[in-house]
Amino acid sequence: MRLLEAAATHPAGAPAKQLAREAGLALPTAYHLLRTLNHEGYLRREKGVFVLGAATERLSAGAAEQNRRGMVADTLAHWCDLIGVPVYFAIYRDGEIDVVSVADTVGNPAVEEWADFRETGHAHAIGQCLLAQLDDEARRNHLDRHPVRSLTPNTVRDDRTLLRRLDALGRMSPVVEQQEYALGTVCAAIPVTVGTTAATMAISVPSSQAYRLKPATRLLQEETGKLLRTLAFSISI
């Protein structure tokens, strides 16, 4: 890594001896590492000097992804503390529901994923909010792969009923779900659309505290509006 850091300071390239000196490595060790880095594509030798190779882009992309995930996690943790409820962030990617990050506390635990979120989008607020943002063909395709099934006595019973509900919601309307995924839990989700990517922020509370859901959702909408740019970064995660 020290050799790569040294090479990065020389856009026009630097010879092996200079890189070894700047990295604080013995020349034989540096030669061995430089050959390896050149073979792996992290460095490229041109006219006697070493320059950064194409593979270093993967390193920077990985670091950028890690930073984005950290920003999302920090944002959700802040909202969890501020609102006093678990907070979820999910996107619809490659035809599947992807819960990117969840923030909760001991006093406000997240919903237990007792049935795979990806397969039960018809039953929870996250899935319903994401499906509402899709066009009719994409919704039907999703339901063909993940059919509606009962999880609780409150779960929607069939595709037709669900599709009517989604049509009535509209793409950018909040979704409230009352014990359809898990008994004892009520949830709300708000849509966050960036470009063509469907995304959602969601919260959950015990059904005994259902009165908290509406004010908590309103506060989440306000906070999401303030930090929409932060959420936009996470779409590429």
Please annotate each region the language model reported.
Residues P147, G225-I237:
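Cysteine/selenocysteine-centered motifs that mediate thiol-based redox chemistry or coordinate metal-sulfur cofactors
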Residues Y42-R45, F89-A90, V192:
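A structural signal for short hydrophobic beta-strand segments in well-ordered beta-sheet cores
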Residues V51-R145:
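Amphipathic alpha-helical effector-binding/dimerization core
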